[in-house]
C-alpha cells in the first residue's frame, strides 16, 4: 500500500516513514535507514525520522552520528523533546563505558 502511494506520490514523507517502521519490524536495518534518510531528505525537520535514525545509529554503535542527529533534533523539537533528552542521556552513558 505504501509502496503504491510512493509510486503515485514520490514526495510522500509519511509513506517512507511508515515503510521504515515496517522494515524495523522485519529487522531490516539497511532498508529502515534508507527510508528514514529519504524522509529527512524530503523534510529535514521530521522529528520522528531524525529520532528513529539517531536510535538506529546508536544501536549500530555509531555514537558520533547518533549524537549529531540528536543535537539537530534538539535544536527545533516540539514533540520529541523528552525523547531527545532521554536519548542524549543514553548516548552519554554508552560513551562513558
For each predicted feature, which ranges?
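N-terminal leader/linker segments that initiate helical-solenoid repeat arrays
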Residues: 1-8
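Canonical positions in the second alpha-helix
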Residues: 5, 38-39, 72-73
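Canonical tetratricopeptide repeat
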Residues: 18, 52, 86-90
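Structural signature of tandem alpha-helical TPR/SEL1-like repeats
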Residues: 25-38, 60-69
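Terminal, low-structured helical/coil segments at or just beyond the last alpha-helical repeat
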Residues: 67-97
Amino acid at each position: 500500500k505504501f509502496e503504491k502511494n510512493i509510486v503515485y506520490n514520490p514526495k510522500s514523507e509519511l509513506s517512507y516513514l511508515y515503510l521504515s517502521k515496517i522494515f524495523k519490524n522485519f529487522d531490516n536495518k539497511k532498508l529502515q535507514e534508507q527510508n528514514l534518510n529519504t524522509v529527512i531528505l524530503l523534510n529535514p525537520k521530521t522529528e520522528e525520522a531524525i529520532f528513529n535514525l539517531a536510535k538506529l545509529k546508536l544501536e549500530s554503535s555509531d555514537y558520533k552520528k547518533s549524537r549529531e542527529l540528536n543535537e539537530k533534533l534538539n535544536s527545533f523539537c516540539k514533540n520529541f523533546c523528552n525523547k531527545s533528552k532521554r536519548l542524549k542521556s543514553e548516548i552519554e552513558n554508552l560513551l562513558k563505558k
